[in-house]
């Protein structure tokens, strides 16, 4: 038994300069784990609650002293003496302590930080890497795979101050033979894209996730400049590199219409599905996340019938890493993939349950960061330990993004031949 001896919560800053919650968990043996909760910008309405103070005189109301107090005053006394190796029990105690469906009493940010710190302390107690401990918890011991990265190199929507409506334009180095090679390919394309944008007189400042945020005439132009950059970097579209979108469509869904204000266009649900189908026919787009609003289930069903056999349709705001909502989606033929963000649900155990449910149903699971991140690289270990197959953790700059890529490099090196990089076959429909 690895008894918890001390838990400390504190307020730290995330990559956007906003406060977030960090937790330290100490065991009687001296083993220790530390983890921080991330924070999103475009959030699904059904996400677990991120507890903020609301005191406008401090951090513009975004302080997290209430969540920190929940750790120090409520969670800590309940977990002292408990076994850190029993992750499901630990998470269950915190969920019961909170007592609400969306974790609004203690805050998902408080519960998650402790949940992840407990897992890290348990890994330290066992003397194993975090991905190995996660694999043990997940029942996937020894079944490791290196994830195909979705690299967000052009930002729009809620992640940037520009006129591009689609939130993320991503490249996937599917033709790489290893994660190390995939990362190099992505970095070379990122630098090539900067040159392409500069040559066109476009802005090369970056958004929250490290991608460029230029003003472009259309979403199609964003795809065109990426294709140019890929080719300039010496790679072949659809062979070495495929494309992925995160529309974050709930952000531009207004009164039953999908409004692309940057292009001065408006679509009903069926027509916007056709728009996405056309884009994926013109370009090698093999994955579309949140292509429709989180409440537009009829539209999602139609889009899934339309292109779900050849394009990965990822539910983020749609499913919010929640098994109850995911089950409805599976039962009703909605999408074919889930985005996994552990702060949407608020504990490691519930996150693992969502990944398992998705995989058992033939869905893919894409492990994801949030736009507000820290140096915490737990999602890298989560992706490898669950053999999820895909990860989305931003562009090829900003330390909060690169921290995850660097951790994946270390894991691949440590695993050696056991680290398989399967490339294109990890993506649903490919």
UniProtKB/Swiss-Prot annotation:
Which GO terms of the molecular function aspect are on file? magnesium ion binding; phosphopyruvate hydratase activity
Cofactor(s) listed: Mg(2+)
Transmembrane stretches, by residue range? Answer: none
- EC class, as a word, reads lyase
Q: What is its EC number?
A: 4.2.1.11
Places the protein is found: Cytoplasm; Secreted; Cell surface
Keyword tags: Cytoplasm, Glycolysis, Lyase, Magnesium, Metal-binding, Secreted
Where is the catalytic site? 209 (proton donor), 341 (proton acceptor)
Binding annotation for (2R)-2-phosphoglycerate: 167, 341, 370-371, 392
Q: Name one Pfam family in it.
A: Enolase_N
Tell me which GO cellular component terms the UniProt record holds.
cell surface; extracellular region; phosphopyruvate hydratase complex
Cofactor binding comment, as recorded: Binds a second Mg(2+) ion via substrate during catalysis.
Source organism superkingdom? Bacteria
On whether Cytoplasm is a keyword of this UniProt record, the answer is: yes
Summarize where Mg(2+) binds, as residue positions: 246, 289, 316
Q: Name one GO biological process term.
A: glycolytic process
| InterPro entries tied to this protein | Enolase (IPR000941), Enolase-like_C_sf (IPR036849), Enolase-like_N (IPR029017), Enolase_C (IPR020810), Enolase_CS (IPR020809), Enolase_N (IPR020811)
The keyword Transcription is annotated on this UniProt entry: no
Q: Which reaction does it catalyse?
A: (2R)-2-phosphoglycerate = phosphoenolpyruvate + H2O
How this chain assembles, per its entry, is:
Component of the RNA degradosome, a multiprotein complex involved in RNA processing and mRNA degradation.
Query: Which HAMAP family has this protein been placed in?
Result: Enolase
- Family to which this protein belongs: Belongs to the enolase family.
Q: Give the protein's function.
A: Catalyzes the reversible conversion of 2-phosphoglycerate (2-PG) into phosphoenolpyruvate (PEP). It is essential for the degradation of carbohydrates via glycolysis.
Q: Which PANTHER family match?
A: ENOLASE
Q: What is this protein called?
A: Enolase
């Amino acid at each position: 038994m690895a008894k918890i001896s001390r838990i400390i919560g504190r307020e730290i800053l995330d990559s956007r300069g906003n406060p977030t919650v960090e937790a330290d968990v100490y065991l009687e043996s001296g083993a220790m784990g530390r983890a921080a909760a991330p924070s999103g910008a475009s959030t699904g309405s059904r996400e677990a609650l991120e507890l903020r103070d609301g005191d406008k005189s401090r951090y513009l109301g975004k302080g997290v002293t209430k969540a920190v107090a929940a750790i120090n005053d409520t969670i800590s006394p309940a977990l002292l003496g408990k076994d850190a190796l029993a992750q499901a029990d630990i998470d269950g105690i915190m969920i019961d302590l909170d007592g609400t469906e969306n974790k609004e009493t203690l805050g998902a940010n408080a519960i998650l930080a402790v949940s992840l710190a407990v897992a890290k302390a348990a890994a330290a107690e066992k003397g194993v890497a975090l991905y190995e401990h996660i694999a043990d918890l997940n029942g996937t011991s020894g079944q490791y795979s290196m994830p195909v990265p979705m690299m967000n190199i052009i930002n729009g929507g809620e992640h940037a101050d520009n006129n591009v409506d689609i939130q993320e334009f991503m490249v996937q180095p599917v033709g790489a033979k290893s994660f190390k090679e995939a990362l190099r390919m992505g970095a070379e394309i990122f630098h090539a894209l900067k040159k392409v944008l500069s040559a066109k007189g476009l802005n090369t400042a970056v958004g929250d996730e490290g991608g460029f945020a230029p003003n472009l005439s259309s979403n199609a132009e964003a795809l065109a400049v990426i294709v140019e950059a890929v080719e300039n970097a010496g790679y072949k579209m659809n062979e070495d590199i495929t494309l992925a979108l995160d529309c974050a469509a709930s952000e531009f869904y207004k009164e039953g219409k999908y409004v692309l204000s940057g292009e001065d266009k408006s679509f009903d649900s069926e027509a916007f599905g056709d728009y996405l189908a056309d884009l994926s026919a013109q370009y090698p787009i093999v994955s579309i996340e949140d292509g429709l609003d989180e409440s537009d289930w009829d539209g999602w069903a139609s889009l899934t019938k339309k292109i779900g056999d050849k394009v990965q349709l990822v539910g983020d705001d749609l499913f919010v890493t929640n098994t109850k909502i995911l089950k409805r989606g599976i039962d009703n033929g909605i999408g074919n993939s889930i985005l996994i963000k552990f702060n949407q649900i608020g504990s490691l155990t519930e996150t693992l349950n969502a990944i398992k449910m998705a995989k058992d149903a033939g869905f893919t699971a894409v492990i994801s960061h949030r736009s507000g991140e820290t140096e915490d690289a737990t999602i890298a270990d989560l992706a490898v330990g669950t053999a999820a197959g895909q990860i989305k953790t931003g562009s090829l700059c900003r330390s909060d993004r690169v921290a995850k890529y660097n951790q994946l490099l270390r894991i691949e090196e440590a695993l050696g031949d056991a680290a398989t990089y399967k490339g294109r076959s990890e993506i649903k429909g490919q």
